[in-house]
Amino acid sequence: SKYVASTPELDEIPAAAKLREDHCGGLDEQIGLCWGHSNQLNALEWHTCNEFNIAVRELVLLLAKREDLDEDDRLNADKVQAFYLAQGEMIEVYSDTLHFCPCEVTGSGFSCIVGLQRGTNLPIAPEQKVNKLWAANKWLLGHEANTGLIERGAFPGIYGENWKINPIIR
């Protein structure tokens, strides 16, 4: 899957200004896009701001609550719930909600418009990546089965089933 934090094409449309005014109190919100193929939990992240997702194609979000982290900041995957978003639906993901890359519903992939406080998810210097901070305003927990992400420095904070969404063949 791919993610672009901010795109001028989306940032400048009238709907983006309405989103900023209606849902962000006029704060500067970047409007980006996440798309591709994904069907497994693999990781969860959180931010200190709310996130808006608009399904361009139908998708499933795997979500949990930060309050479900144990005293070692680890999460049992049994706490994760799947939420379906139909094409065109918008959801506000609160800052205390663990989330990550959407999962595709069909084999044709997913596409999602993402609204976040400007600067969120931008790269940070390697020495800043401490205490699960992975990018600007992005804290990340990798599933312990996701060895590629763990080898790149993610905290192995999710254990149990690495949930998989099986796409529908249409």
Would you name each region that the model predicts?
Residues 1-87, 100-170:
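Active-site region of the double-stranded beta-helix
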Residues 93:
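Aromatic-residue-lined binding/catalytic grooves and analogous aromatic/hydrophobic interfacial grooves
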